[in-house]
UniProtKB/Swiss-Prot annotation:
UniProt-recorded name of the protein: Immunoglobulin G-binding protein G
Leader sequence segment: 1-33
Gene Ontology annotations for the cellular component aspect, listed alphabetically: extracellular region
GO-annotated molecular function: IgG binding
Annotated source species: Streptococcus sp. group G
Pfam families found in the cross-reference section: GA-like, Gram_pos_anchor, IgG_binding_B
Positions of short motif LPXTG sorting signal: 559-563
Stretches the record annotates as 2 X 55 AA repeats: 303-427
Modified residues (Pentaglycyl murein peptidoglycan amidated threonine): 562
SUPFAM superfamilies (alphabetical): Bacterial immunoglobulin/albumin-binding domains, Immunoglobulin-binding domains
Residues forming coiled coils: none
Length: 593
């Protein structure tokens, strides 16, 4: 449809130009004919249009008739040209109006579509529908969408994250907007000159604003030359009705400056009063001066940093804020938008926030705990050796090892060395009832040198004292009473019986005392052979006679003494006297009874 309109427009332009050229040609021919000298008398046909009422010559009348016909023809041509120009202007105006209406409808549709994306109320949709120009639609759309974005951020909805991630940086967005607007303006100007789609495609494929403007200037310049060459009055009127390109560019720059200024004010939550001042500014310079004054009056901001330690996102970012609380809100929203949930810390000295993402919570039943190798050293009575086990901790390993020891009949004292992860069990000695114990014993020997009993015997005892008691009981039981000696080296006791001789009295046998303690069975003494005993006694007596005589002589000269230094003879005599007195007393008592 668009292409068909352009073709019709081009045909109308061509027809208009052709008519103009024809009219000019006719006028020129007429002027040439009038100015040329008349050499031949023209022949006036019968029935000529002019008569000779004024007495003019026939030649003059013929010329005047020809001039009249030429004038009529010229007037008709001019009338046709004017009518064609008027029709062409009306068609061009209608086409321009239709194109503007289409552009306005498209802009409204785009704005309403974006409003629906942000859930904008019907109030703002009605404002869009009532807008009269594309520029008005776009300005209102930019303001409403920006406010909607802020509202969505404050609500912290889940859909905000996806939307923000899909947005391009502000600088790129501005460049993209400028490039798109430059292309629209360029195509609009190319449409004015009926430029072909080939050149429009070149405009649409340009990557920079500068490229668009350069291409636009070249194409428009060529189109202007072509249109001027057509020399149509309608074209001149049309061109005069257009807004100068310089004013159009200034208007675009002013609109862009206002949009950017309002965005900057939105960052700081500036009221609508200052935004209205921006929107009412008439020049770009006025907008910039006003935004500088407003920002200078705002509270001073600081740069805050955020360090992200996430599972999948790590890095740093910064923001400008009037205080730490404001920066924290911005950073937490940023972290939430990027799926980072963790522990927050803040260092006021460096104005740095740090968020460390929490580790993923895993079901304990799904965990495979780390294990350690533990060793058991067994020092048992019948089982000795080492074994190992894998366990998550020492307590678990201890239970396993104690069960193992119990299963193998090992019961002892437990120790643990954490440095080497080693348990040691040393088995306890067997507990035996004291009544069942058989103490270690030693063999002791007794040598008896008695008057009637001579020989040796032995006994087993736990110590010398016990053996001495047993030997003395044995000697007493056998009527041996003498001097006792003990050699620890040979574990030998010796008892030498004392000899008591009282003149005039028959020797009396001492009374045996009754045993007061249980007797320990002893090995009977080995009696000495009689012949050998007699020989030994004879030899001893012969050897003792000279010595006895000498001793008797000395004893006669000295008095007997007491104690260990006294002569055994006197000791024995005293004992005999005492025994005799005791026996006599007993006999007397019996007689009295």
């Amino acid at each position: 449809m668009e292409k068909e309109k352009k073709v019709k427009y081009f045909l109308r332009k061509s027809a208009f130009g052709l008519a103009s050229v024809s009219a000019a040609f006719l006028v020129g021919s007429t002027v040439f004919a009038v100015d040329s000298p008349i050499e031949d008398t023209p022949i006036i046909r019968n029935g000529g249009e002019l008569t000779n009422l004024l007495g003019n010559s026939e030649t003059t009348l013929a010329l005047r008739n020809e001039e009249s016909a030429t004038a009529d023809l010229t007037a008709a041509a001019v009338a046709d040209t004017v009518a064609a120009a008027a029709a062409e202007n009306a068609g061009a105006a209608a086409w321009e109006a239709a194109a503007a209406a289409d552009a306005l409808a498209k802009a409204k549709a785009d704005a309403l579509k974006e409003f629906n994306k942000y859930g904008v109320s019907d109030y703002y949709k009605n404002l869009i529908n009532n807008a009269k120009t594309v520029e008005g639609v776009k300005d209102l759309q930019a303001q409403v969408v920006e406010s909607a974005k802020k509202a969505r951020i404050s609500e912290a909805t889940d859909g905000l994250s996806d939307f923000l991630k899909s947005q391009t940086p502000a600088e790129d967005t501005v460049k993209s907007i400028e490039l798109a607007e430059a292309k629209v303006l360029a195509n609009r100007e190319l449409d004015k000159y009926g430029v072909s789609d080939y050149h429009k495609n070149l405009i649409n494929n340009a990557k920079t604003v500068e490229g668009v403007k350069d291409l636009q200037a070249q194409v428009v310049e060529s189109a202007k030359k072509a249109r001027i060459s057509e020399a149509t009055d309608g074209l001149s009127d049309f061109l005069k009705s257009q807004t100068p390109a310089e004013d159009t560019v200034k208007s675009i720059e002013l609109a862009e400056a206002k949009v950017l200024a309002n965005r900057e004010l939105d960052k700081y939550g500036v009221s609508d009063y200052y935004k209205n001042l921006i929107n009412n500014a008439k020049t770009v310079e006025g907008v910039k001066a006003l935004i500088d004054e407003i920002l200078a009056a705002l509270p001073k901001t600081d740069t805050y940093k955020l360090i992200l330690n996430g599972k999948t996102l790590k890095g740093e970012t910064t923001t400008e804020a009037v205080d730490a609380a404001t920066a924290e809100k911005v950073f937490k929203q940023y972290a939430n938008d990027n799926g980072v949930d963790g522990e927050w810390t803040y260092d006021d000295a460096t104005k740095t926030f740090t968020v460390t993402e929490k580790p993923e919570v895993i079901d304990a039943s799904e965990l495979t705990p780390a294990v350690t190798t533990y060793k058991l050293v067994i020092n048992g009575k019948t089982l000795k050796g080492e074994t190992t086990t894998e366990a998550v901790d020492a307590a678990t390993a201890e239970k396993v090892f104690k069960q193992y020891a119990n299963d193998n009949g090992v019961d002892g004292e437990w120790t643990y060395d954490d440095a080497t992860k080693t348990f040691t069990v040393t088995e306890k000695p067997e507990v035996i009832d004291a009544s069942e114990l058989t103490p270690a014993v030693t063999t002791y020997k007794l040598v008896i040198n008695g008057k009637t009993l001579k020989g040796e015997t032995t006994t087993k005892a736990v110590d010398a004292e016990t053996a001495e008691k047993a030997f003395k009981q044995y000697a007493n039981d056998n009527g041996v009473d003498g001097v006792w000696t003990y050699d620890d080296a040979t574990k030998t006791f010796t008892v030498t019986e004392m000899v008591t001789e009282v003149p005039g009295d028959a020797p009396t046998e001492p009374e045996k005392p009754e045993a007061s303690i249980p007797l320990v069975p002893l090995t009977p003494a080995t009696p000495i052979a009689k012949d050998d005993a007699k020989k030994d006694d004879t030899k001893k007596e012969d050897a003792k006679k000279p010595e006895a005589k000498k001793e008797d002589a000395k004893k006669a000269e000295t008095l007997p003494t007491t104690g260990e230094g006294s002569n055994p003879f006197f000791t024995a005599a005293a004992l005999a006297v005492m025994a005799g007195a005791g026996a006599l007393a007993v006999a007397s008592k019996r007689k009295e009874d």
